[in-house]
């Protein structure tokens, strides 16, 4: 068993690596223009080129993939020559600083030909002092310096250059300035170290936003899962044991009806009844990302929508599997030998009949976490699926790639759990 689990884990890790390449390539090739989404539809080619350069989006695809997966701080540290430190402010924004030997943190800015150091003291106060002593000389006599700027980038400045760049000035928007950096390296630790970057849409760390959205989806999916799965399995087994009876026909027809109704139609129908006509429940989540914790009653309609849809599908799969097992020769042989009915059913039939539903259930765990985007949009629920949809529409590359990889991790993880459960449900299965 241990060898099987280790082998499966290695295979799943290789799968995730290959899928990460596919996710990156598909996201990069998706339609949309990041610069136009951020700067506006009237952006000029010069502004777009400067913006992409500052975000590192004009780098070759292999370099961008490497930075997204394992980060860029290790590369920037060699250029800056100082350790780099990542801070998250009280408002949730990310700041990168270079660490001085004395313990202070520093960033730089260029004012004409004067290099200004912004030194952050341990108490949080920031002091600006001239720091021209850090200019380095090349063989041709030109002066240059690699440092960290206030926009969380490692930048290369050259003294005396008149390079033009478009920068964001608070209160004024994007403005053209002279003396821009010659090269930019946006700083992040990478997906594998829990820092896929900053959202282009919100300016906040993607990891923190994903954690909140994933937590909200887990709440919704967990409640729906806890309600649906025991009920669907019990009803499916009961229907399968009474094939052709009134109970079987009623459950089969009801399950088919609920499973074919589109998610948006089911959600709107429940909103009309319980929110508009009866006024018992709120029809939408109208608060922020922490709404599920502030108003638990807002979970009722989304959970009920998922429950009705999932109940019908899992019930039908369980019923079909139970009917097939009860018709098997070894079940008939057990009855002929005189074994008690309950022993045949619960020790032999049910265990084998659960193999197909377990596969479906594990697949639906992925759907409950990230595939219920329609339900989340209908109810305005701040979950992972809605976050991925908003990121895709905006082409928020960092958020979209990280969210997609979270779904991949969940998918391969649930598949591993399903494979392990098979060995307990069916002793005929042997893994070597």
Regions inferred by a protein language model and the residue ranges of each:
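N-terminal signal-anchor/first transmembrane alpha helix
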Residues: 1-60, 108, 113-157, 211-212, ...
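Alpha-helical transmembrane segments of integral membrane proteins
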Residues: 2-3, 214-247, 260-263, 275-432
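Phosphate/oxyanion-binding loops and surfaces in catalytic or ligand/nucleic-acid-binding neighborhoods
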Residues: 24, 58, 72-79, 264, ...
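An internal, D/E-rich "acidic patch" concept
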Residues: 60-229
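C-terminal TM-helix exit segments that contain a strictly Trp-centered aromatic cap at the helix terminus
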Residues: 267-275
């Amino acid at each position: 068993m241990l060898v099987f689990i280790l082998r499966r884990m290695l295979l799943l890790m290789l799968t995730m690596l290959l899928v990460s390449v596919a996710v990156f390539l598909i996201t990069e090739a998706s339609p949309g223009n990041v610069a136009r989404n951020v700067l506006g539809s009237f952006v000029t080619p010069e502004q777009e080129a400067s913006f992409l350069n500052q975000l590192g989006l004009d780098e070759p695809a292999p370099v961008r993939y490497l930075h997204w997966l394992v980060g860029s701080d290790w590369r920037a540290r060699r250029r800056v020559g100082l350790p780099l430190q990542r801070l998250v402010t009280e408002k949730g924004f990310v700041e990168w600083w270079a660490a001085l030997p004395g313990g202070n943190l520093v960033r730089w800015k260029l004012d004409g030909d004067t290099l200004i150091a912004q030194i952050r003291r341990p108490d949080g106060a920031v002091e600006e002092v001239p720091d021209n002593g850090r200019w380095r000389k090349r063989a041709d006599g030109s002066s240059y310096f690699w440092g960290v700027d206030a926009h969380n980038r490692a930048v290369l400045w050259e003294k005396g250059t008149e390079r033009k760049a478009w920068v964001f000035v608070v209160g004024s928007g994007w403005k053209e300035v002279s003396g821009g950096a010659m090269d930019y390296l946006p700083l992040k630790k990478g997906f594998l170290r829990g820092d896929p970057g900053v959202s282009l849409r919100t300016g906040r760390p993607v990891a923190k936003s994903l954690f909140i959205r994933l937590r909200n989806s887990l709440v919704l999916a967990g409640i729906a899962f806890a309600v649906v799965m025991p009920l669907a399995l019990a009803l499916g087994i009961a229907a399968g044991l009474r094939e052709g009876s009134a109970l079987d026909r009623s459950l089969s027809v009801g399950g088919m009806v609920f499973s074919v109704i589109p998610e948006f139609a089911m959600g709107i129908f429940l909103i009309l009844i319980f929110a508009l006509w009866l006024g018992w429940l709120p029809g939408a989540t109208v608060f922020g990302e922490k709404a599920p914790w502030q108003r638990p009653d807002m979970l009722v309609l989304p959970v009920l929508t998922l429950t009705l849809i999932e109940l019908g599908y899992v019930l039908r799969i369980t019923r079909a599997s139970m009917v097939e097992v009860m018709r098997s020769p070894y079940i008939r042989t057990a009855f002929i030998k005189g074994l008690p009915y309950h022993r045949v059913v619960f020790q032999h039939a049910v265990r084998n009949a659960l193999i197909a539903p377990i596969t479906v259930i594990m697949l639906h765990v992925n759907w409950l976490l990230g595939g219920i985007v329609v339900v989340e949009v209908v109810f305005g629920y701040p979950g992972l699926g809605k976050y991925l949809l908003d990121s895709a529409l905006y082409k928020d590359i960092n958020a979209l790639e990280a969210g997609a990889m979270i779904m991949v991790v969940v998918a391969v993880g649930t598949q591993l759990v399903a494979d392990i459960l098979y060995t307990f449900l069916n002793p005929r299965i042997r893994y070597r």
